Design a protein with these regions (language model features):
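C-terminal regulatory/interaction module of P-loop NTP-utilizing enzymes
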Residues: 1-169
């Protein structure tokens, strides 16, 4: 159902992750996962990075309500896990924003493929970097695919930026 799918913040590329196998297991001492899970639970529950993300992030014009919320929640989660001490450079932050947008774009592309009209055709999600340039984030696996190049349905008018487009706002 598209209504449920639209509520996903990110669609992670599982095909880019290594398959779990016995070579990742050890016979030596290891980190107990219960302890790690409890540490992450405490860290994630008692730290709020959403406000920081909201003030540092400038998103493009095709980013709509659920897109914005999903992108910001994903970036806040990255900051909690990767920078629990609180410091993050602008380059790192922009990388996290780009990856969050890429994941959200995957959700939008899948919804656009399943919907007969142009409700989800605005897949050109972007952000404004620290130099003031608008960066449209593409998914590597769909670059050059007709449904991504031209997400509009015939006969419906939707303003969509060109694939890979970057320009000053």
């Amino acid at each position: 159902d598209l209504a449920v799918m639209d509520r996903f913040c990110i669609y992670m590329p599982g095909w880019e992750m290594p398959k779990n196998s016995s070579e990742y297991l050890t016979n030596n001492y290891g980190f107990i996962t219960d302890y790690l899970a409890e540490a992450f639970h405490y860290q994630l529950k008692h730290t709020n990075r959403y406000e920081e993300v909201s003030t540092r992030t400038k998103l493009g014009k095709f980013v709509e309500g659920r897109d914005e919320k999903g992108i910001k929640k994903t970036v806040a989660a990255y900051l909690k896990m990767l920078h629990p001490h609180g410091e993050c450079s602008d380059e790192e932050f922009e990388e996290y924003v780009a990856y969050a947008i890429e994941g959200r774009r995957r959700v939008k592309e899948q919804m656009n493929k399943r919907k007969p009209d142009d409700e989800f055709a605005n897949i050109g999600l972007s952000f404004i970097n620290t130099q003031g340039e608008e960066i449209v984030v593409d998914c590597p696996e769909t670059m050059g695919v007709e449904a991504t190049i031209n997400p509009k349905k015939p006969g419906v008018n939707v303003d969509v930026p060109e694939e890979g487009q970057s320009h000053d706002p």
